[in-house]
Amino acid sequence: MSTTTADRYTIISSDCHAGGNHAQYREYLDPAWLDEFDAWRGRYKNPFRDLQDDGRSRNWDDERRITEMDADGIVGEVVFPNTVPPFFPTGVVIAPAPTAEEFPARLAGIRAHNRWLADFCAAHPTRRAGLGQILLNDVDEAVADIRWAKDHGLSGVLLPGVAPNTGIDPLYAPTYDPIWAVCQELEFPVTHHGGGSGVPDMGRFPASMTMYILEVGFYANRALWHLIMSGVFDRFPELVFVMTEQGTGWIPDALDRMDSIHDSMVKGKFGGELGPAAMQLPRPPSEYFAEHCYVGASFPSADDVNQFERIGLDRVMWGSDYPHREGTYPYSKESLRLSFAGWDEATLRRIFAENVAKVYGFDLGALDAIAAECGPLVAEVAEPLEVIPTDATSPAFFRP
């Protein structure tokens, strides 16, 4: 018996990753950099297992990717980078900001990726929303890259992290007002992904990696209070900001803390000597969050989703993190059952598709037609998961 849109959920993942391989990126690179690229490519040793094994082609193989996502019940995706673009030491999400000397080559590298991504998304424009990359070393170049991304069919911009004391201004600096202005003008959401790009150098000590793992989330989370408390959303009242794969449990406490600090400052209890920014915010920080911010909740556990109502059910967007090992593929349907069984259908339609469609401009009608064939059944998601797949690798299945 055939099913209809009403029988199934439309699932758009707010967090997926893709990228070209080095041979593909070479085709998209400015010809002026080809000789240097060939020399760099000959020296480069890829440290990432998932970019060496059979799974690596999920990043760029159109047929494989669509087939696997259909089987997993996912019909749309927000596309973040994953592979290593020209002249980078690692993937962009975890790479530190380039030095002044590294900047020209790295800029050529992300522009090659952006060109590749525009073509990748154009192959399935209904199903893919790509995020163009920028670097913050040169604001004028970043603004130009944002305009290029909009003109070439991409759906938003990926905001890098800024580690302390790197020589690049922090995100709370007015330096970046031209970036916020052009994103507001173009109705281009600004998206910040969890990762190591904003983490300072931890040194080479026995506990360095432990400290990195403990603190990487904090350095990503900082972007939220940097933008809110510095008045970015007051100056740019139509700007949209998304935080993806950064967890959810920390957000209510962070908003409470910002509100408390703001309240104390405006009442003159403390902080006047530290600067006027928070004192001049006409409203509590949590109100700016409720109007401007969204959360890409990647592979949320049953406990994580308990925070969604405090965050705002119209602010949360589910993500699979395909094709990462910690993501829910190939058991996204089982993950949804584990985390969301018993939830109200209308609420889940918001979390699974409506919110992300609003932010990134997906055509829900077109995706509903695809989901009518492969989306998870509403009745299936409502049924609690009793047995976790034995080969599941996502923390969604093992976190409380």
PLM region spans:
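Mid-to-C-terminal alpha-helical segments outside catalytic/metal-binding sites
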Residues: S2-I12, N21-G76, A108, R115-A123, ...
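Flexible loop residues that form catalytic
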Residues: H17, N82, V162, G195-G196, ...
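Active-site gating loops and adjacent loop-to-helix segments of metal-dependent hydrolytic enzymes
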Residues: H22-R56, V92-F103, L107, G198-V216, ...
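Aromatic- and glycine-enriched glycan-recognition loops and surfaces
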Residues: D54-E63, A108-R115, L136, D140, ...
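Short glycine-enriched loops at secondary-structure junctions
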Residues: F80-P85, L136, G194-V199, P323-H324
